[in-house]
Swiss-Prot record:
BP GO terms, sorted: formation of translation preinitiation complex; translation reinitiation
Protein name in the entry: Density-regulated protein homolog
Residue ranges with Low complexity bias: 87-99
GO MF annotation, one: translation initiation factor activity
Region (Disordered): 62-116
InterPro entries assigned: DENR/SUI1_TIF, DENR_C, DENR_eukaryotes, DENR_N, SUI1, SUI1_dom_sf
Pfam families: DENR_N (PF21023), SUI1 (PF01253)
Organism in which the protein naturally occurs: Caenorhabditis elegans
SUI1 domain sequence ranges: 117-176
Length: 192
């Protein structure tokens, strides 16, 4: 500092700052729920820009939301990864086109089978999709009902941890009236 200058020290003590009106009003994007200056990182920049133009044009002043799509590396990260038993490409398109129905228009059947997995066993259910039953909902119901793990592993297959075949023979017709007792086949135990 030179001889004639005086330093202005602003207090960093907690409390209100002069010239600022309280409570502070925060504005968030109605599409990505981030502050507007972060809309560029949401992956929905075009939708965020349209929302801001319509609802809060004053937010666009001084902001630069880029028009460029995400880079190839970012795009690959955003793609949903298929897990075990998931279909990709032509197989997924064919399953969607057929509506999950079995080929050939054969009789509608639900099959139950116990499979050994190491020292324990799992129950495999096939054929529920032929009755227009949502497999994710059914899997969640089985997991809650039997207090065990249950997952959709294929286009028309649910795997439940544990041997619950006998309980399923009663539960399926009770929960889904379109499936009768005669349409459920117990295939027994699968050999190793």
């Amino acid at each position: 500092m030179s001889d004639g200058e005086t330093a202005v020290i602003q207090s960093l003590a907690p409390g209100p700052i002069d010239g600022v009106s309280y409570p502070l009003k925060m504005v968030y994007c109605g599409q990505c729920s981030m502050p507007p200056e972060y809309c560029d990182y949401s992956g929905q920049t075009d939708v965020c820009r349209a929302w801001a133009t319509q609802n809060a044009p004053e937010l666009l002043e001084g902001l630069e939301i880029s028009d460029e799509p995400a880079a190839d590396g970012d795009e690959k990260k955003k793609q949903k990864r298929g897990g075990k038993g998931s279909k990709t490409g032509a197989a997924a398109a064919q399953a969607a086109a057929s509506g999950g129905k079995k080929k050939g228009g054969g009789p509608q059947k639900v099959t139950l089978q116990r499979e050994p997995r190491g020292k324990k066993s799992v129950t495999v259910i096939k054929g529920l999709a032929t009755f227009d039953i949502d497999l994710k909902v059914a899997s969640k119901l089985f997991a809650q009902k039997f207090a065990c793990g249950s997952s959709v592993t294929g286009a028309d297959e649910i795997v439940i941890q544990g041997d619950v075949k006998d309980d399923l023979l009663d539960l399926i017709p009770e929960k889904w009236k379109q499936v009768t007792d005669e349409q459920i086949d117990d295939l027994g135990d699968k050999k190793r």
